[in-house]
């Protein structure tokens, strides 16, 4: 029977949950030597003292390049490495810092029991499967931002806005393909600080020949500067760039920009919308086809984007951070597997949500990417999305059952026009029956545009008739169908367990629908490793 009462309980909380084991800097140094050709390693410059004894990761500079190793022995030992350059903790590209912050939070989540540790045995001397494809080492400052809006800084000096990492990543992809010869169309938008920002792409012919790999001070001409600055401006405008000292754009702006203004086929894949193995396969397949991709993450300070253009036998991805070549190297992008989250982890357990953008020039004879629906459930306003049964269970076989889809998001990278439903699947995964199709439409019966990156924060009711379902155990999943397409399961694996027996039907959510509605206070000291008690109020909204 479903318990609907709100209950008051006392919970004994430990001040420390230790699943992993912190390793010392000396132990990390020994690990780093395994990945050095000469065995000569040194702690990275400017590592603060508070990060050297209880660190989530350790960075060591080599004679050439650097290595980053995990600070926890339950994790994969190697985190990332570079064959050139050095690591300076005080001069880390923001995109890389986001990734490192995410890793640090992942280690903390593992050590507190909120996430599963991921440990894979690696080769000490990995070989490259796909060599880095992109040769440009571009940045966000001059001359790249020469055509960006101007602003006045705190010292009353006129400065140019940064191009934005999103534009720099996009521009490097386009330079790799040297495409298109000329843009398409016109676009403008209103910016709260700079007014109307616009570009007439159709008037712009891109001077690919005069875009060089490196723009070192005093080593490029005005023509070369203008060539790259125009490309950067057009990329920024097409992405609806929020210009400023630090500029940013949404991952969901990429695919429309590539398609509408630059004659590319493009597809956006959100990591939350597919299994890690599939996500990795999409990346490696694209790289093996000789096409670099854009990798995006969203953190507390906004979105970041960078280029992934190769990988090694450990499946570490080669990253071009878009910071003038600084810190480019091979990194483990699989450490934040969403499947490793524990109960309560949800989609907000780590600092960034991840996705990739694929792009290929839409030339004659080139097949465009297939549109793949990526509808899924997300955490919104501290409410976890999912699929829930509205009524009391069990019910009589033959009755209609109302099933709610909560916090449904479109992560497809393109607008969705179509219908939602629920499907009943047997133990073999075969579709047995479906509910009533619910078209997303307006009052005139026209399909609504479910824009990319948006969500329905209201519960969407689906109706399932249980007549004709044979006795047995089933799984009920949310389904979507783009207009003129086929039914597909939601990318989220959320489901209901259905049991049909003796004329009764029972639907149970395997995902707890429990919310914290109140928490008491604790008067006293809390010591590491010692338990303490506090009263909290929770509400069980689950089917059981």
Where is each model-derived feature located?
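Short, non-transmembrane alpha-helical segments in secretory-pathway proteins
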Residues: 19-49
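Noncatalytic regulatory segments and standalone regulatory/sensor domains
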Residues: 23-24, 28, 56-57, 79-127, ...
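Active-site-adjacent substructure of cysteine-protease-like catalytic cores
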Residues: 45-63, 256, 260-320, 328
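Catalytic Cys-His active-site segments of thiol-dependent hydrolases/isopeptidases
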Residues: 70-85, 313-335
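Active-site-adjacent structural segments surrounding the nucleophilic cysteine of cysteine proteases
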Residues: 78-247
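Short, compositionally biased P/S/T/A/G/V-rich stretches that sit at domain boundaries
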Residues: 342-413, 426-430, 497-541
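Extended low-complexity, serine/threonine- and proline-enriched intrinsically disordered segments
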Residues: 413-441, 544
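Aromatic sugar-binding surface patches on proteins
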Residues: 441-463
